[in-house]
Amino acid sequence: MMFRLTSVGCFLLAIVLLNVAVLTNASCRNEGAMCSFGFQCCKKKCCMSHCTDFCRNPGKRAHGHGLLRFWGQR
């Protein structure tokens, strides 16, 4: 009888844990959705109030001016 109660308890615990896992993943936001924090997004990246794979910094281009100035001083 004890074995039956233990296995039923484990089975119910497994169902509860699976439901928690499904609910946790269902609450995340897809790419392009509005966000305030990274944990709200499925990919854990909130950039400029939108869920995204990576952040782009408009207006900041990668220039080698600093490197060229460094080599020019030598």
From Swiss-Prot:
<comment type="similarity">
    <text>Belongs to the conotoxin I2 superfamily.</text>
</comment>
<feature type="disulfide bond">
    <location>
        <begin position="35"/>
        <end position="47"/>
    </location>
</feature>
<keyword id="KW-0027">Amidation</keyword>
<feature type="modified residue" description="Proline amide">
    <location>
        <position position="58"/>
    </location>
</feature>
<feature type="disulfide bond">
    <location>
        <begin position="41"/>
        <end position="51"/>
    </location>
</feature>
<keyword id="KW-0964">Secreted</keyword>
<feature type="signal peptide">
    <location>
        <begin position="1"/>
        <end position="26"/>
    </location>
</feature>
<keyword id="KW-0165">Cleavage on pair of basic residues</keyword>
<dbReference type="InterPro" id="IPR020242">
    <property type="entry name" value="Conotoxin_I2"/>
</dbReference>
<dbReference type="GO" id="GO:0090729">
    <property type="term" value="F:toxin activity"/>
</dbReference>
<feature type="propeptide">
    <location>
        <begin position="62"/>
        <end position="74"/>
    </location>
</feature>
<dbReference type="InterPro" id="IPR013141">
    <property type="entry name" value="Conotoxin-I_CS"/>
</dbReference>
<feature type="disulfide bond">
    <location>
        <begin position="46"/>
        <end position="55"/>
    </location>
</feature>
<feature type="disulfide bond">
    <location>
        <begin position="28"/>
        <end position="42"/>
    </location>
</feature>
<keyword id="KW-0732">Signal</keyword>
<dbReference type="GO" id="GO:0005576">
    <property type="term" value="C:extracellular region"/>
</dbReference>
<dbReference type="Pfam" id="PF17557">
    <property type="entry name" value="Conotoxin_I2"/>
</dbReference>
<protein>
    <recommendedName>
        <fullName>Conotoxin Vt11.3</fullName>
    </recommendedName>
</protein>
<keyword id="KW-1015">Disulfide bond</keyword>
<keyword id="KW-0800">Toxin</keyword>
